[in-house]
Amino acid sequence: MKTVLFRQHGGPEVLEYTDFPTPEPKAGEVLIHLQAASLNRMDVFVRNGWPGIKLELPHINGADGAGEICALGSNVSNFKIGDRVVINANFGCGKCEFCLSEQDNMCLDWHLLGETIRGTYAEYVCVPDRQLYKLPEKFDYHSSAAAALVYQTAWHSMVKRGGVKAGETVAIIGAGGGVNSASIQIAKYLGAHVIVVGSNSNKLAQSESIGADILINRSKEEDWSKAIFIATKKRGVDVVVDNVGTTFPLSLRALRKGGRLLTVGNSGAPRFEIDNRFIFAKHLSIIGSTMSTAADFREVMDLVVTGKLKPIIDETFPLKEAAAAQERLWRGENFGKITLDIP
């Protein structure tokens, strides 16, 4: 099969478009002929080399993918050859206490497709059948791949962990990334009022086009927490979605008393200082999560395929141009998701 892989960690130059053996499905697995894959910042982190990451080289990037089942392993009864599917990249073992209590994103032997398991920058991939969602006949593969990881991540964080409710005000820090564009739509779907803080006027305008009510340009408002206080009549917001990390100090300031800070990542940096006095004096909660449960994935994909949530695709590259796609992602030029077209 054709694939894009790397044989050593490094910059985009280590990515190689080449032939690689097509995998064969084991018991409980299916082989998918992929039609689309979607990029995540994790792809670049893995390519560069996480400290302590353990994976088999050569490695294939890619958590998100959608396509058609072309072969079945033994003991697969819920799907058939020809089914159109999208992949849930959140791999639990299916056996531990967390998986058995339907908290598979907390699995004791948790893996993410494309991180420690060869992923979707390829013509074919094998995955357990429990990781699949069956797509309607005409639903677009690229939209499916663009939705899978970011929508389940944002849904689990905002709905199941954060408890965002209609009438609340949610501030989303950053305009452009896949999780944040999903978060804007999910917050609006839930009936919340949305403030987006960003530094790019074009991306802020695009955020408004998908539902943002108030835009704050942090390149003009260095202390944007004050701008949020003014916008909320000195009350503060109920919820801040902050996946940057280094912006936590201002996010804590922007929250009302009893507010919640939700986080699923740290695109800025993993280590930074915060003032604990804001947390205990304002009765704040910091709520982290990773990915979602299988039930959350099905729930949010139901909303996607019925058009209640609409994935934003920034640009599509041919598979062989994955390096250029990653460079665009890393430069932060995208609004929404970048996808790969797989022949």
What would you call each of these model-derived segments?
Residues 91-174:
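NAD(P)H dinucleotide-binding glycine-rich loop of Rossmann-like/cofactor-binding domains
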Residues 198-199, 243-312, 341-343:
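Glycine-rich phosphate-binding loop and adjacent beta-alpha segment
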Residues 1, 170, 308-312, 324-343:
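C-terminal capping/lid region of NAD(P)-dependent oxidoreductase domains
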Residues 174-175, 266:
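NAD(P)H cofactor-binding loop motif with strongest signal on the N-terminal glycine-rich segment
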Residues 21-37, 50-100, 126, 136-138:
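Glycine-rich beta-strand-centered segment in the early N-terminal region that forms part
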Residues 172, 188-247:
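Adenosine-nucleotide cofactor-binding segment
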Residues 153, 178-179, 247:
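Hydrophobic/small residue at the entry helix of a nucleotide-binding pocket
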